Each structure stands twice: as C-alpha cells, then as structure tokens.
Regions:
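Structural recognition of the beta-strand scaffold that forms the well-ordered cores
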Residues: 42-45, 87-92, 135-136, 227-229, ...
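Beta-strand-rich binding/interaction modules
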Residues: 484-511
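N-terminal structural segment of carbohydrate-active enzymes
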Residues: 25-136, 141-153, 158-160, 169-218, ...
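Intrinsically disordered, low-complexity Ser/Thr/Pro-rich tracts
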Residues: 1-32, 543
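Short glycine/proline- and charge-enriched loop/turn segments
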Residues: 101-110, 288-298, 384-387, 520-521
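Loop/helix patches that line or flank the sugar-binding groove of alpha-linked glycan CAZymes
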Residues: 38, 83, 260-263, 275, ...
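C-terminal beta-strand-rich structural cap/linker in extracellular carbohydrate-active enzymes
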Residues: 518-543
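Alpha-amylase-like alpha-glycosidases and glucanotransferases acting on alpha-linked glucans and related
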Residues: 31-43, 144-240, 247-363, 414, ...
C-alpha cells in the first residue's frame, strides 16, 4: 500500500529533540523519527449516496465519485483549481437495507445502489493515480438484523448460536443514553445498542472474531483499500451493564490492530471513539489503534469560532499534545452525525473561515466532511445532514443528478451561492479559502508535522502559535473577532525561537516583522503585523 502512495507523498522527518507544546513542554519527538504517511494527508469524508449520481437514478454512486475526482485532486500538486485533498473516507459501501449503510447485510459485497466491486476497484485505482488514499467505513460492532447470520443465530444453527448476544430473560439494564438495548425475539432477548434493527455481535466468540478478521483482510488485501474507519469502537465488548470503553474492548481492539498490522503494516486504522479526550486517547497511547477522531477538539473549535474567543481551542490543543503520541489523532469540525458547521455558526462565513484555518494549520490529521468547503447547511434529523452535494445553482438537483429529483431534497441555499460553481467564480469564497489552506498545508511540511507552541497575545481574540521543525518556523495568527486588531503584541517563553531576522508572509496579505529574540530564545512586545482584519488568518515564516 505505502509503495503505491509514495509516488505522491513523502514521510515527514522531524528534527531531533523538538520540545512539543506550551505549558507542559515535556513531550519530545525522538531524534530522526518519521511520522506515518497519514500525517501528510488531508482526508475528505464522502457519503456516497449524496456525492454524485452517474446513472440518473437520483442516488450517488462510486462512478459518480470517479467523475468528480478532478474536483477533489487532479493529480498535479502545482495546480490550484482542485481542493487538494489526499485521502478519501467512504462511508459504508457494503450491501445494506438502509439508506445510511451502517447495518450491513453482506460484508463482502457492494450496495447495488452504489455500483459493483469492480467500480470500487476502479475508484481506488483512479485515486491512487492521483496520490489519494482510500479508506472505507467498517462496522464491526453490529450488523443488520436482516443479515443471514442473525437468523441462523436465532435458530441456534451450528456455529452461529453465539454469533450475537442472547439472554433467556431480559437482563433489565438500559444503554448509556437510557435507551432500550435488550429486544425480544422468539421468546428470548438479544442485545442491540443502536436499536432492534442492529443487533450487536458477540465479539467474545472466537468464531465471530475470526470472521471479522477475515473481512478486514479481504478489504485490505483483495480490494486494496488503504485503511479502515472503525465505527462505534467504544461499544465493542460489553462487561455486563458496562457498555463503553471496557477492558475487554481495549483488548479486542489491540488484537485487531495486531492482526491488521500483520496483513498490511502500512494500513491505517482510525476509530470513532465518541468520548472525551482522556478516554479516546487511551486507545492510541496503548497502541490499539492508529488514530481516533477528536470530538472534544472539534467542539472547542466551533465553540471558539462562534464566541469569537480561541481560549478553549488553546486549552484543548495543549491537552492533545499531552495525551497523544505526537500528531496521532484525527481532527475535524463536524461529521455525518452532527449538525453541519455552517448551521452551527448560523451562516457566519467569517467564523467558518476561522474554524477552517484552525483545523488546517494545527497538528493532527484533518478530515473534512463533503460540502463543508462550500458551507452547506444541515440540521438533524440525520438525513438532512447527508443531503446531495451542491455542485451548481440548478433548482432541485444542483448538478448532482440528471433525474427529476434526488433521493433526498437539497439543503437550502444552492441557488444563493452555496454551490461549487458559484464559489468558483468568487475569488474570496469559502471554497477558495479552503483550497488555499489545503494547498498551504500540502506545501509546508512544518504544518503537517511540526510541533506547536502557543504564544501569549495581548488581544485575547487572537490565536497566535508557532509550528516548528528542525530548520523551519511558522507563526500562525488567526483573528477570531469580527473587528480588526491593531497594536497586537506577542510574548514567547524561553526556548520559543532561535535567532531570527526575517519575516515572510506565506498566507494572507500584508507585511510582517521579525521579533527581537533574547539569548534564551524568549521574546516580548513583539509586533508581528500592523493590523489583522476581521476573521483574518496570516501565516508568517520566521528565519
């Protein structure tokens, strides 16, 4: 796998003994250590049903994604008309009775709404030609109740009786959110955390584990994906009424990771552990999974952008530095289960730019949700978070399909500027801001793999931090406020900087000045710019 991807990306080598963080300053990068290939990536989450319809049935499909690959990445790093993402996360593509696909009928077959396995292999090949990795959603916690395995288990067929979790009498406890988890069937009860239509696998059954291992092997070896996004990891193995982050779940996850590493040492495992940073980071720190999604951090960015105050972001970023192996967490703003960013921010494009800038200039592995880059709107129920991609201003269909209507009505705004076509015509659009930020991250190894140091800013509405590598230092300034900032002064503690004499703006407009650095590497009363505009981001190389 890595050999395929090395044509486009390279491992980022970190300098010896860089100090990471601001407050703790205890974690260091090992001399000459290389970060994994995924740290060079910006991933893009796609709900296949809603991205592009290629055959006119009103539903998105795999061939539709192939048709739109040039929008995502045209394969030429020197161009700027594509988005520039370098990884795709496909939400479930397996055969399923539901629109969302998280209740799987057949783990080795493609949902016919989306195409065929040959179509998926063609998409993977086309993506790899552009240097784009492809990972797929994998649901190991539960299946569809319509999966043949469940009926065989209910009937007690040999080899399947304990495939799911059964009880002769209702154990009586409820789920973590107070929901019913024990469901009657044939005079007995089965456990289904996410509802009666999605019974949980019995992952303490070696036969189930062996089957799921072989499914992972099939997708990595036979299909050729570059990794797996694991759904609902914290719920894998229950211990009585304890249903989240159990010791048994950690053990099962660690064993799966070891198996996957044997199959493909370069495969990425990224997990959904919808918990606080402390619980989520345990899976990575223990070597049980490569990355987990950072839900606390995502919330801090949106809260900070919405309140025009980066204080919470700074606190969370420092916590990530302290809790995770360096850079080994997946950052994002929102996903398919959450209200869309622009809806959370009440249509404020300036705040959306602040959120995007924070995400794409910070450590970690960033993930975008399709349509986020154009400010698509969406609030629950879930179907309204997963509406068709708005490619143009065409009423009803937005360039998504040639059918009279898409499978789901559009979100508001495609005729009022929330579309790719409209924003491509506007140099100052949110889409072009995302393109520029992703290009910046792709071009600057220090943004992908450098350490992070917060700076004290005289204006609390400004998020000011350094990204540092062996021979490179970048100063990032993000004005969270809707007002201009003048007379900004920064202060850095001992060891913050080497001697620098030059300052070059590499993102944003205007000039910049270099700081006067003391012998101990500290500086104070540093005025890097004359002013920052409302919601402005400026990145400055110090040398």
């Amino acid at each position: 796998m890595m050999r395929r991807l090395m044509r486009w990306g390279v491992l980022v080598w970190m300098c010896a003994g860089l100090v990471v963080g601001a407050a703790a300053q205890g974690a260091t990068q090992e001399p000459g250590a290389a970060l994994p290939w995924w740290n060079d990536r910006v991933f893009y989450e796609i709900f296949v049903r809603s991205f592009q319809d290629s055959d006119g049935d009103g539903k998105g499909d795999l061939r539709g994604i192939i048709e739109r690959l040039d929008y995502l990445n045209d394969g030429d790093p020197s161009t700027t008309a594509d988005l520039g993402v370098s990884g795709l996360w496909l939400m479930p593509v397996m055969r399923s009775p539901s629109y969302h696909g998280y209740d799987v009928l057949n783990y080795r077959d493609i949902n016919p709404d989306y195409g065929t396995m040959d179509d998926l292999r063609a998409l993977i090949a086309a993506a790899h030609e552009r240097g784009v990795a492809v990972i797929v959603d994998m649901v190991f916690n539960h299946s569809s109740r319509a999966n043949p395995w469940f009926s065989r288990s209910a009937q007690g067929q040999e080899g399947f009786g304990d495939f799911y979790i059964w009880a002769d009498a209702n154990p009586g406890f409820r789920g973590p959110d107070g929901q019913q988890v024990w469901h009657p069937y044939g005079g007995r009860f089965y456990y289904g955390l996410f509802g009666s239509n999605m019974p949980d696998f019995n992952l303490e059954n070696p036969a189930v584990t062996a089957e799921l291992y072989d499914i992972a092997r099939f997708w990595l070896e036979d299909v050729g994906v570059d990794g797996l996004r694991l759904d609902a990891v914290k719920h894998y193995v229950e211990e009585g009424s304890e249903q989240e982050n159990t010791a048994s779940t950690h053990a099962w996850m660690g064993a799966l990771n070891a198996f996957v590493t044997d199959v493909d040492p370069n495969a990425l495992l990224v997990g959904e552990v919808w918990n606080n940073t402390y619980d989520a980071s345990d899976y990575v720190s223990a070597g049980e999974i490569d990355l987990v999604f950072e839900f606390d951090y995502a919330q801090s960015i949106l809260d900070g952008a919405g309140r025009n105050d980066p204080a919470g972001v700074i606190t969370l970023q420092q916590r990530l530095i302290e809790q995770y192996p360096f850079g080994q967490y997946a950052t994002f703003l929102a996903n398919h289960d959450q209200n869309r960013v622009m809806s959370v921010l009440r249509g404020n494009t300036g705040q959306a730019r602040v959120a995007a800038a924070t995400l794409l200039t910070s450590p970690g592995v960033p993930f975008l949700y399709y349509g986020e880059e154009i400010g698509m709107l969406g609030v629950k129920p879930d179907e309204r978070l997963r509406t068709p991609m708005q490619w143009d201003e065409t009423p009803v269909t937005a360039g998504f399909t040639s059918a009279r209507r898409p499978w789901q009505d559009l979100a508001p705004g495609n005729e009022e500027g929330i579309s790719v076509a409209a924003q491509e015509r506007d140099p100052e659009s949110l889409l072009n801001f995302y393109r520029a930020l992703i290009q910046l991250r792709n071009n600057e190894p220090t943004l992908r793999a450098g350490d992070w140091l917060n700076l004290r800013a005289s204006n609390r509405r400004v998020y000011a931090f350094l990204r540092r590598a062996a021979d490179d230092t970048l100063l990032v300034l993000i004005n969270y406020d809707d007002q201009p900032v003048t007379d900004l002064e920064l202060e850095g503690r001992a060891g913050a900087l080497p001697l620098v004499t030059n300052a070059e703006v590499i993102f944003g407009e205007g000039a910049a000045a270099a700081p006067g650095v003391a012998d101990d590497g500290s500086f104070e009363a540093y005025r890097p710019v004359d002013a920052l505009g409302p919601y402005e981001t400026r990145v400055i190389r110090l040398s």
